[in-house]
Amino acid sequence: MRDAIKASQAASAANRFGLGAKPGELAAASNDPRGWLHQQLRPTSLSTVFAALPNSSDILQREYEYKQTKRAGKQAGIGQSGPGNAQVEGNAASDARKLRRHERPAAQGGDTLMQTPGMRAPDMRRDASPSDGEPPEFKRQRRELARSAWADIDARYRWVASTDASFVERLTRFWSNHFAVSVDKGPARLYAAPMEREAIRPHVLGNFNDLLLAVETHPAMLRYLDNVASVGADSIFATRTEQRMQRMAAQGNAAPKRKLGLNENLAREIMELHTLGVDGGYKQADVVEFARAITGWGTLMPRDRQGSGGDASGANISTGFVFRDAAHEPGERVVLGKRYAQDGQAQGQAILRDLALHPATAQHLSLKIARHFVADDPPPALVARMAHAYLVSRGDLTHLYTTLIDSPEAWSPTARKFKTPDDFVVSVMRAGDIAFDRDPRMLTQLLEHLGQPVFNPRSPAGYPDTAADWMAGDGLWKRIQAAEALADRVAVAQQNPVAAAQASLGAEPVTGDFAAGLRRAGSPREGLALLFASPAFQWRA
């Protein structure tokens, strides 16, 4: 009886808390399932799988050079085949479309379900021909940016399929979705994956304040929520710009159409989504004041690297953050009734620290984590216990996770979560030891087909996290298709449906009609497809 309980808890540890069991993993967890999770919470160095990837500062530099090459080509008339002809690919919109196609090409060949309509893969090996209107350097730079983006996706899924610390990896993906950015936002496109490895992975076992600051100062978030364009109305930069516009008007010249101003997007989403929650007690005036406090938070330019940025300070050369004092709104701020008299960058940092330790933040984060790991409607007592642990530890995330693990509600036999498409695909990869041969295009197209494209949520709120959101429409039918396609990629030597089911789910669920159905399947491949599509596999129990 005791062994049966431990076996069941081992399956929960690997599937409910982790990302799905690899072959042999349930046996490793069965002696002490809770201890198996606790052991993963010990900080370790980041995986070498990410070591060769460029940091965001390097990507910013490459992107700048790419745009400079494009601009130079446009000024030189490159892309014109003759007098009167329209310039080929000579505007920012078409350029962005081409970069987007390089970053998210369709799989070539393979199952038709992988080939999402409208997505076609360009030949990234082909240099520009003399007649295509683009200089070779321009195409080379675009290919390098695209390769960098694909390398990040490849590393992410190679790691998730092989890691022995799948609980920590699930936590990483939880926070990545909590601080969601989307590749659909052009300026943020190249930085979504780097943000996960640069801002989230190093702090997932640390303090929430450090995690929060790292994310909110990352180029991905600053660009996604438009803070790079936020300028204080009374800032030095705004004053100079206004004076210049007045001189232009006096000389009879047209003023620029785009005007400088405050952008509230980042401040609002930090309060509503990242910390306090929508019912966290803040008002519009708090959002405005906070937005003023973080004016000047921007991204590195080449001149900042060379020490000639003038108004730039507080630069993080690896992640690409910079504080521009000339764009910062001067003066004191009042947020949630507290006065902040700090100067410059320190003002926004002080507000972030207080938001991180606010009781509403403790409640909001605890509810989301409990919902992610236990149930769509988690027990209020569990949420309250986690919120208390968060506050008494002053935002220590490991203490928060430990409280979750040690709570009896988290191990209830009735607790379960329906897998998101990403959860489903990753758990199949782990159960079937499936690799994508350093080419993640088939994988990304599969997730697109299932409704969860990689780093592309529909809003800053991230991907939904309840069963109702993922079971609607034709989602279940698409999972059956995906199960069949993924079963094809399992090595022949591992195509034993019953053994695979027991290794991934434990022996307890693999009985009766379910086990009989796996044995009666027309072929081992069909049996694996039946396993992957089964309710037992689709739920994190």
PLM features: residue spans?
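Flexible, low-complexity segments enriched for small/polar residues
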Residues: 3-6, 11-25, 50-63, 70, ...
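A general structural motif at alpha-helix termini
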Residues: 30, 41, 215, 404-405, ...
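Active-site substrate-binding loop specific to GH73 endo-beta-N-acetylglucosaminidase modules
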Residues: 118, 123-138, 145, 152-156, ...
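N-terminal accessory alpha/beta regions
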Residues: 23-178, 182-203, 223-237, 243, ...
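Short, solvent-exposed helix-helix connector turns and helix-capping sites enriched
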Residues: 9, 31-32, 396
